[in-house]
């Protein structure tokens, strides 16, 4: 029982560390990808994406958008 609890705790700690590292990698980007927060104080959207005025995240460009 103690061993399985330790495995669960170490597994959760590993998952937390990996997600934190992925988040650091995302914040290091120069531009925002799909569903990335954009707007004032945030990085601009990458080419091929526009900042949605309603939701304030990067969405794919469509022919009807300006």
From Swiss-Prot:
GO molecular function, one term: toxin activity
UniProt keyword annotation of Ribosomal protein present: no
Alphabetically ordered keywords of this record: Disulfide bond, Ion channel impairing toxin, Knottin, Secreted, Signal, Toxin
Subcellular location, record wording: Secreted
Disulfide bonds: 31-46, 38-51, 45-58
Any single Pfam family the record assigns to this protein: Toxin_12
Cellular component GO terms held in the UniProt record: extracellular region
Main location: secreted
InterPro entries for the chain: Huwentoxin-1, Huwentoxin_CS1
Signal peptide interval: 1-21
Tissues/organs with expression: Expressed by the venom gland.
Entry annotated with the keyword Secreted: yes
Propeptide feature ranges: 22-29
Domain remark text: The presence of a 'disulfide through disulfide knot' structurally defines this protein as a knottin.
Function of the protein: Probable ion channel inhibitor.
Entry's family note: Belongs to the neurotoxin 10 (Hwtx-1) family. 29 (Jztx-13) subfamily.
Protein name as catalogued: U10-theraphotoxin-Cg1a 1
């Amino acid at each position: 029982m103690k061993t399985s609890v330790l495995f669960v705790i170490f597994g959760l700690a590993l998952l937390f560390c990996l997600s934190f590292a992925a988040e650091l990698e995302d914040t290091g980007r120069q531009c925002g990808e799909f569903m990335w927060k954009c707007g004032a104080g945030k990085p601009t959207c990458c080419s091929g994406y526009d900042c949605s005025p309603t939701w304030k995240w990067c969405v794919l460009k469509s022919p009807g958008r300006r």
